[in-house]
């Protein structure tokens, strides 16, 4: 998958988690920039990403994701 395809998939997942079809993610988007993307919804998002991409993130990775681009990069590293 290309970075843009992964970003599109992540956008769709977050829209589903937050029930908000207006969300548009970029690689620079941080959680604190998106309304209602709190720690509970972050975990729901991460679990949905793991299911969609067939991966399992390490806790250290989850804690270190500073923005959406870091998630894209990690997924690419994992061969997705």
Task: Give the ranges of each region predicted by the language model.
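Phosphopantetheine-dependent thiolation modules in NRPS/PKS and related acyl-activating systems
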Residues: 2-47, 51-80
């Amino acid at each position: 998958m290309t970075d843009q395809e992964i970003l599109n998939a992540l956008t769709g997942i977050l829209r589903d988690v937050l029930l908000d079809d207006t969300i548009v993610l970029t690689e620079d988007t941080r959680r604190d920039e998106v309304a209602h993307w709190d720690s509970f919804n972050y975990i729901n998002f991460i679990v949905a990403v793991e299911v969609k991409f067939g991966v399992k993130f390490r806790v250290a990775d989850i804690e270190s994701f500073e923005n959406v681009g870091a998630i894209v990069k990690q997924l690419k590293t994992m061969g997705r």
